[in-house]
Amino acid sequence: MSKQRVFIAGHRGMVGSAIRRQLEQRGDVELVLRTRDELNLLDSRAVHDFFASERIDQVYLAAAKVGGIVANNTYPADFIYQNMMIESNIIHAAHQNDVNKLLFLGSSCIYPKLAKQPMAESELLQGTLEPTNEPYAIAKIAGIKLCESYNRQYGRDYRSVMPTNLYGPHDNFHPSNSHVIPALLRRFHEATAQNAPDVVVWGSGTPMREFLHVDDMAAASIHVMELAHEVWLENTQPMLSHINVGTGVDCTIRELAQTIAKVVGYKGRVVFDASKPDGTPRKLLDVTRLHQLGWYHEISLEAGLASTYQWFLENQDRFRG
């Protein structure tokens, strides 16, 4: 039996590289990988020619233009245009070249700013989005709807998963535009090295957030991709939509900061600056559907933070930022 030829779009990113690591351990797939220089995903002709020549069986669509609040506010046109082009080019070229299985990786920012907690898949398009990343979120919603529409019109098997906040190896540790976990890991690391008496964390520490290690995300992605078609249909009708991926467990930012301090070995005080904004009080995905499909996360937050910090220590000379 010939191996399945699997294209991972975005194989150098945090999620794509985690999917690659797990698939490389298997003997039943042949990975097809292209760097940005080798294949410009914004070029529809280049993407079509790639699919026409490579005989791809499955696609993991993990490529995206990503960034923090400042980047989203400064370059909204780039975020909506580039993400919609990447998705449109890959999904359409996959269809034109008879690739029947594809998994699109979205983001929990697709849900309304004031969505009911925990956020079920049915909350999609039920309210106004968070303004700071609306263009990016709309592009991700378009990706879900592209998959859904090619399924409905052409009978394709294009699936979507929506991850919660991710962290792990190959994250962005830039001091000013990274997400909360890499930002705090770096800050506590530097405070420890400098023997700083305290570390100030923005906000009251009371907001609750959910975090998933990227290796768990990769495992969930492969699990969902490999579900029997009938099982997928049963769990995503009537619109063949998407599946949330998370832990179903959240923690306060205070608990997160204290756990990071423990992992890093920081002995000073953790101070919360309540004059700084907190953001949404709670953001948690409803993962009932994922659990019904037989997948549960395996990496605890503390264990995941410890392994991520170890990766940070080993890659300080080359990490992003």
UniProtKB/Swiss-Prot annotation:
UniProt: substrate binding residues: R187, W202, R209, D278
Main location: cytoplasm
A Pfam family hit: Epimerase
Molecular function as annotated in GO: GDP-L-fucose synthase activity; isomerase activity; NADP+ binding; protein homodimerization activity
Keywords: Cytoplasm, Isomerase, Multifunctional enzyme, NADP, Oxidoreductase
Effect of R187A: Decreases affinity for the substrate GDP-4-keto-6-deoxymannose
One GO CC term on file: cytoplasm
Disulphide bridges: none
Reaction(s) catalysed (UniProt annotation): GDP-beta-L-fucose + NADP(+) = GDP-4-dehydro-alpha-D-rhamnose + NADPH + H(+)
Annotated site location: Important for catalytic activity: S107, C109
Signal peptide boundaries: none
InterPro entries in the cross-refs: Epimerase_deHydtase, GDP_fucose/colitose_synth, NAD(P)-bd_dom_sf
Keyword Ribosomal protein attributed: no
Activity modulation: Subject to product inhibition by NADP and GDP-fucose.
UniProt site positions, description: Lowers pKa of active site Tyr: K140
Pathway connected to this protein: Nucleotide-sugar biosynthesis; GDP-L-fucose biosynthesis via de novo pathway; GDP-L-fucose from GDP-alpha-D-mannose: step 2/2; Exopolysaccharide biosynthesis; colanic acid biosynthesis
CDD domains: GDP_FS_SDR_e (cd05239)
List of residues binding NADP(+): 10-16, 36-41, 105-108, 140, 163-166, 179
pH influence on activity: Optimum pH is 6-6.5.
Gene3D superfamilies assigned: NAD(P)-binding Rossmann-like Domain (3.40.50.720), UDP-galactose 4-epimerase, domain 1 (3.90.25.10)
One Gene Ontology term from the biological process aspect of the record: colanic acid biosynthetic process
Effect listed in the UniProt record for changing K140S: Nearly abolishes catalytic activity
The family this protein is said to belong to: Belongs to the NAD(P)-dependent epimerase/dehydratase family. Fucose synthase subfamily.
Function: Catalyzes the two-step NADP-dependent conversion of GDP-4-dehydro-6-deoxy-D-mannose to GDP-fucose, involving an epimerase and a reductase reaction.
Protein name according to UniProt: GDP-L-fucose synthase
Species, as recorded: Escherichia coli (strain K12)
Taxonomic lineage of the native organism: Bacteria, Pseudomonadati, Pseudomonadota, Gammaproteobacteria, Enterobacterales
Gene name of the encoded protein: fcl
